[in-house]
Amino acid sequence: MAPVYGSSRRAGVTGPWSMLRPGPRSALPRDLFWAPLSPLDNGALAALIARAESVDDPPYRTTAEETAEYFVDPTYSGVAGRDALGVMRAFALVRLRPAGEIYASLIGVVDPDFRRRGIGGALLHWQTERARHLIGTERAGAAPGSKAATTPAHVVTTVLEDDERMKEHLGDLGFEP
């Protein structure tokens, strides 16, 4: 795997934090029907990831037990896109990871048969907006200037070393290795 991609708030006005300022919500593509992702979706989620991994051929395979762990984190937000037959074709998840600093971890996949339609890029925009919201929620109620209010926050994801398409999407958003 390649190094973790991410950015801190220090990235300035050209980094991904600049696109996280308040504004219109991302529009998820209308090719799919979108709904919140929940633990009840785990079977369909594991099947989607298996389809993607069979094409992408990472050096591992994700099990349904592992995808069930996505929902263990107390603070997460996810969305699933389904086709007209109800088959999950894409998902995106943002989780706040416990650490000394705030880490919003992004994970998602688009079914190989539904790629190159703008779904992945739209999901990344959705994820960065959700990350901003979750980080803001984490800081809500903290006294101004307190450690809780000023703890650095990062938006991160991992990318397979040879996944040039994903690296390009992330680069377009200002993320860097």
Residue positions per predicted region:
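Short, solvent-exposed polar/charged micro-motifs at secondary-structure junctions
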Residues: 44-45, 68-70, 165-167
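Polar low-complexity intrinsically disordered regions
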Residues: 1-14, 18-19, 86, 106, ...
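Conserved donor-binding loop and adjoining core beta-sheet/short helix segment
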Residues: 40, 49-134, 156-159
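Phosphate-binding glycine-rich loops and adjacent basic patches that engage nucleotide phosphates
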Residues: 2-13, 27-34, 46, 84-94, ...
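Short, flexible, glycine/charge-rich loop motifs used to bind or transfer phosphoryl groups or to couple energy/partner
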Residues: 23, 68-69, 145-146
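A general secondary-structure signal for short beta-strands and their flanking turns/coil
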Residues: 29-30, 101-103, 152
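Short amphipathic alpha-helix that is part of the acyltransferase structural core
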Residues: 2-66, 82
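Conserved active-site alpha-helix within GNAT-family acetyltransferase domains
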Residues: 121, 125, 129-177
